[in-house]
Structures are given as structure tokens and as C-alpha cells.
């Protein structure tokens, strides 16, 4: 398939494009800087009118949630990069003589808002904080593609784990020095997924004709923040007992600290029920694969 990828130069998008090429697909990346960090075999375009016919769209565009305090200006940038990009994709699809067969659009488990320990599947109610409202509006725009005859899946992604990006990249330096540990009381849930499993789930949704609607992009082995810190310390053979106080996170990150001090126990119910198989269902196995080997 010819597949348009927004956010294709990012932490998840580049890995996805590599996998698409390996499986014989033709990824086309929409980016503001087509000449920056090119991937061999991947065509980059700066505007939608340069794309040409595609059979699928993967919409991963979005400014990182954790890069900077949530000022009013920052919040607007987060909205524009997600909701605005999705609206532009829908407007582009309307004018196409032949529309894509499928759209897989990003979202996040922030859709559920801060929750207690009760497991959440895709039928759970949404939250009402900023992150939840951002995800709700983002998904609502993407699902309008169904009205155009485009099979649409929204992927509510958890904490994506790999060593060269995302949350784990920021965590590794202090943990390797023995300075890691839980955040706040450590009881908040962390719903995570290995990047290889997330990329695999995107391909699975692209090619599975029955798939549509919301899917949780999380591994089944959710853990508390304290367990995550302990497990990472064990894999690295380092102590992980240095707690970061909640007040320090609130002081440093403001409203955004809620993403660190609260969580959700999100389960991939739809993916499991429909036959998706995780390579890394447990946290220890995922972390061993990422940072446990001697050469990593």
C-alpha cells in the first residue's frame, strides 16, 4: 500500500516507516522540513497536494505533551498540532477523487483522565481535564472520516518505551547513576507499551478490515509507578529508591505535573479480544529487551 504518515519524522513515525518499508509498503511522510533527517526509501512532502493517491493514512502528528509547561500558548500549539492537522487531513480527503480506505489516527490514554486502580477498557467514560479534552476533540475530528467512507481507528497510546526517545530516554540517565525512583507516592498507574508492539498494532489496524473505532495502545502488564521504577532499577542493576516529591514536580511542571503524579490502569481489551499478539506483554521483558542486553 501507499501510506501517508503524518508525524513520520518522530520517535514513533520513523520506526513505523522502517517497518512499512520492510513489509513492502510505500510510506510518504508529510513534514514541514522534507529535507531534514531523510530516511532511505521514504518520500517526504511538505504539502498535502503533493501526496498523490494513497490507500491509507496514519496520523501521528502532534507536539510532545511533556516538552514545556502548559502555558496558554503551549496548550494552543498542542491543539493545533493535533486537532488542526486532523482537520486539514479531513478537508484534503473530501476533495480526493479516490479516498484512502483506512485512517489510523493517534490519540492517548489521557482520554480517560486521572483514575484510580480500576482497569479501564475502551468503553470507559472520558475524563475532563486538559489532556482528556484534547484527546476527545482530536478523536472526534478523526472519526469524521467515517462519514467519508474511510474506515477509521483511533489509537489511545500509553507511555511508549524505547531507549532513544520518549519518557524512557529521559529516565535512563538518573536511573543509570542510581538516582532514580518513584514519583510522588508511586501508587499512580503507568500504562506503557514497547514501541515495537505499538508499531505492530498500527500495521495490524491498517490491514485488518474489521477494525474500527477506539483501541488502547497499551500492553496488558500495567504497573504502578513504584513498580516501574523498581523494575527499571533491577534491569539496570542499580538502586531505585530516590523519590521525587510531588511538590517538586508541581513546582517544576505546573499543571503538566498531573501526567506524572496521576495515571490510569488502561487495558488493551479490543486488541486482545480481536487477536493481536504482544511481543512484550510484561514490563520486565520489555525493559530487558531495551536496556538489559550488555550492548545496550
Can you say where each PLM-predicted feature lies in the sequence?
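N-terminal Rossmann NAD(P)H-binding glycine-rich loop of SDR-like oxidoreductase domains
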Residues: 3-23
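NAD(P)H-binding glycine-rich loop region in Rossmannoid oxidoreductase-like domains
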Residues: 35-88
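Conserved Rossmann-fold NAD(P)-dependent oxidoreductase catalytic core, especially the SDR/UDP-sugar
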Residues: 87-129
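Conserved beta-loop-beta element that borders a ligand/cofactor-binding pocket
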Residues: 107, 140-163
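Glycine/proline-rich active-site loop of Rossmann-fold NAD(P)-dependent oxidoreductases
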Residues: 136, 148-150, 161-170, 205-215
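Alpha-helical substrate-binding/gating segment
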Residues: 172-180, 188-222
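Mid/C-terminal beta-alpha module of Rossmann-like enzyme folds, strongest
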Residues: 208-255, 288-296
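C-terminal amphipathic/interface module of NAD(P)-dependent oxidoreductases
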Residues: 258-296
Amino acid at each position: 500500500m501507499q501510506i501517508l504518515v503524518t508525524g513520520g519524522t518522530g520517535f514513533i513515525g520513523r520506526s513505523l516507516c522502517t517497518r512499512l518499508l520492510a513489509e513492502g509498503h510505500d510510506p510518504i511522510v508529510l513534514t514541514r522540513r522534507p529535507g531534514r533527517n531523510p530516511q532511505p526509501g521514504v518520500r517526504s512532502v511538505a504539502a498535502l497536494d503533493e501526496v498523490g493517491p494513497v490507500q491509507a493514512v496514519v496520523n501521528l502528528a502532534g507536539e510532545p505533551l511533556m516538552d514545556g509547561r502548559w502555558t496558554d500558548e503551549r496548550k494552543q500549539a498542542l491543539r493545533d498540532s493535533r486537532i488542526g492537522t486532523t482537520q486539514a487531513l479531513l478537508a484534503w480527503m473530501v476533495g480526493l477523487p479516490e479516498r484512502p480506505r483506512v485512517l489510523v489516527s493517534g490519540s492517548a490514554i489521557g482520554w480517560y483522565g486521572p483514575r484510580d486502580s480500576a482497569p479501564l477498557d475502551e468503553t470507559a467514560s472520558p475524563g475532563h481535564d486538559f489532556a482528556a479534552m484534547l484527546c476527545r476533540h482530536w478523536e472526534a475530528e478523526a472519526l469524521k472520516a467515517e462519514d467519508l467512507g474511510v474506515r477509521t481507528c483511533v489509537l489511545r497510546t500509553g507511555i511508549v518505551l524505547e531507549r532513544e526517545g520518549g519518557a524512557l530516554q529521559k529516565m535512563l540517565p538518573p536511573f543509570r547513576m542510581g538516582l532514580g525512583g518513584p514519583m510522588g507516592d508511586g501508587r499512580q498507574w503507568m500504562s506503557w507499551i514497547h514501541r515495537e508492539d505499538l508499531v505492530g498494532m498500527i500495521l495490524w489496524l491498517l490491514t485488518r478490515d474489521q477494525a474500527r473505532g477506539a483501541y488502547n495502545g497499551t500492553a496488558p502488564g500495567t504497573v504502578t509507578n513504584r513498580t516501574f521504577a523498581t523494575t527499571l532499577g533491577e534491569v539496570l542493576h542499580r538502586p531505585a529508591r530516590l523519590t521525587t516529591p510531588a511538590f517538586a514536580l508541581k513546582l517544576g511542571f505546573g499543571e503538566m505535573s498531573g501526567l506524572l503524579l496521576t495515571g490510569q490502569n488502561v487495558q488493551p481489551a479490543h486488541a486482545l479480544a480481536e487477536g493481536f499478539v504482544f511481543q512484550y506483554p510484561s514490563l520486565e521483558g520489555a525493559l530487558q529487551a531495551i536496556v538489559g542486553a550488555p550492548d545496550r
